[in-house]
């Protein structure tokens, strides 16, 4: 068996991927915040001055506000999708490497099954924890 969660926590590649994903998320959050600030600024201007504006100006600003709301909503959806794509891009190679190494350890040691230990409620004394073997294969 192997506790994959424990293994992942120990991998420098995962720490690096976590860091890159956090940076990416922070960049997205900054862009989102700038859109919201722009909207709030224009809305405040509209609320404070609309009574003195011409109908054409008021309608123009209302259209701008509506477009900004749509842009904010679209960006939020797109950023969630982009974040998920980035996460897969960063973690899939790591997970594929782990799978390959698990297979290698299994074949080398003639194991018929390797279970994920993070979900096991009981492990008998005959069970083999392959964590040391995996760490060696992954260079941890």
Q: PLM features: what roles do these ranges have?
A:
Residues 1-140:
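Amphipathic, charged alpha-helical segments and their helix-to-coil junctions
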């Amino acid at each position: 068996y192997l506790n994959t969660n424990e293994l992942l926590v120990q991998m420098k590649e995962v720490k690096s991927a976590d860091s890159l994903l956090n940076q990416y998320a922070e960049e997205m959050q900054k862009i989102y915040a700038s859109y919201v600030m722009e909207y709030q600024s224009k809305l405040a201007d509209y609320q404070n001055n609309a009574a003195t504006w011409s109908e054409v100006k008021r309608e123009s600003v209302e259209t701008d506000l509506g477009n900004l709301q749509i842009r904010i909503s679209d960006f939020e959806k797109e950023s969630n999708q982009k974040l998920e794509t980035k996460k897969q891009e960063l973690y899939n190679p790591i997970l594929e490497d782990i799978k390959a190494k698990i297979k290698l350890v299994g074949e080398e040691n003639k194991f018929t099954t390797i279970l994920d230990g993070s979900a096991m409620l009981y492990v008998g004394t005959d069970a083999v924890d392959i964590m040391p073997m995996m760490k060696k294969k992954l260079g941890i």
